[in-house]
Design a protein with these regions (language model features):
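Immediate flanking context of iron-sulfur cluster ligation sites
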Residues: 73-85
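Zinc-dependent deaminase
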Residues: 1-25, 87-149
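Short, basic and Ser/Thr-rich N-terminal targeting/leader segments
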Residues: 27-31, 77
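Small-residue (primarily alanine) positions within well-ordered alpha-helices
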Residues: 16, 20-23, 33, 43, ...
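A short, polar/charged loop-to-alpha-helix boundary motif
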Residues: 51-61
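Residues that line or immediately flank small-molecule/substrate-binding pockets and catalytic motifs
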Residues: 49, 83, 107
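Short beta-strand scaffold segments in enzyme catalytic cores
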Residues: 31-39
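Short beta->alpha transition motifs characteristic of CBS
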Residues: 42-49, 125
């Protein structure tokens, strides 16, 4: 990965972290996601599972729906998804169905992340990069769960 791409990924991950902070402030599990298409943010979302009483209202699912509406179609073939925590198998399935070619996440999720349970669910040509601003993403999650215990 070039320095320019690394800088871009960090810049967009900071936007996803901003969404995660908003979720934290609302009492939601602090995961944020953004979708970028041709260097333009077309969707911003965070977890809404508590607010909507909907177990499927994950940040990635919300962002995919917004992006599809923005682009007028269900395939996000020119997009990159940035999410603060590794997607779960459900979200990874939706990412695969939407044909997102590039996924960038912050903190790994060894307990519920797709790489452990469903590593082949993404489109076969999809590029998946983890560890971008990993410590910041992990700290926000740890702070949230620490405050709940």
């Amino acid at each position: 990965m070039t320095n320019e791409q690394q800088n871009k990924d960090e810049q967009y991950m900071r936007k996803a972290l901003s969404e995660a902070q908003q979720a934290f402030d609302e009492g939601e599990i602090p995961i944020g996601a953004i979708i970028v298409c041709k260097d333009r943010i077309i969707a911003r979302a965070h977890n809404l599972t508590e607010t909507l009483c909907d177990v499927t209202a994950h940040a990635e699912m919300q962002a995919i729906t917004m992006a599809a509406n923005e682009l007028g179609g269900k395939y996000l073939t020119d997009c990159t998804l940035y999410v603060t925590v590794e997607p779960c198998p459900m979200c990874a399935g939706a990412i695969g169905w939407a044909q997102v070619p590039r996924i960038v996440y912050g903190a790994a999720d060894p307990k519920r992340g797709f790489q452990e349970y469903a590593p082949r669910v993404l489109h076969p040509k999809a590029e998946c990069i983890g560890g971008i601003l990993e410590e910041e993403c992990r700290q926000l999650m740890q702070e949230f769960f620490k405050s709940r215990r």
